[in-house]
Amino acid sequence: MRNTGAGPSPSVSRPPPSAAPLSGAALAAPGDAPSALYAPSALVLTVGKGVSATTAAPERAVTLTCAPGPSGTHPAAGSACADLAAVGGDLNALTRGEDVMCPMVYDPVLLTVDGVWQGKRVSYERVFSNECEMNAHGSSVFAF
């Protein structure tokens, strides 16, 4: 019999939703759960010429993930994560290296950092007088 939409359709017996087979995560055994949960730490760092995020086009961008372990496109993810952990994720606490000499040339670069550090949102923007000054601050975090 074909259902044309006119009149009652033939009754079809279906199992109740609770009797449906389990799949995916529902099949996972309790022992398969992660041993410990962690707060995410994942950042996107960009750098571009200029003094304002509205006018400076990003020239380079990297990703930096520090939890559960260092990864991302940052060239020194391990040391950058260690440097951030040492200051509790406070980007303002990253200090300038004393042994770095930079030229006194004004060619401003804008650094932005957005993402999450240990579960808390991060939005950081800073203008450096030139790229050497940016690299001198923040040790390996800003060196990309």
Curated annotation (Swiss-Prot):
Result when mutating M104 to K/R: Also inhibits trypsin
Q: Its domain of life?
A: Bacteria
Using the UniProt annotation, give all residue ranges assigned to the region (Disordered). 1-25
Show the stretches that span the lipid bilayer.
Answer: none
Has the keyword Transcription been applied to this entry?
A: no
PROSITE patterns attached to this UniProt entry = SSI
Function of this protein?
Strong inhibitor of bacterial serine proteases such as subtilisin.
Q: Which family does it belong to?
A: Belongs to the protease inhibitor I16 (SSI) family.
UniProt protein name: Subtilisin inhibitor
Annotated gene: ssi
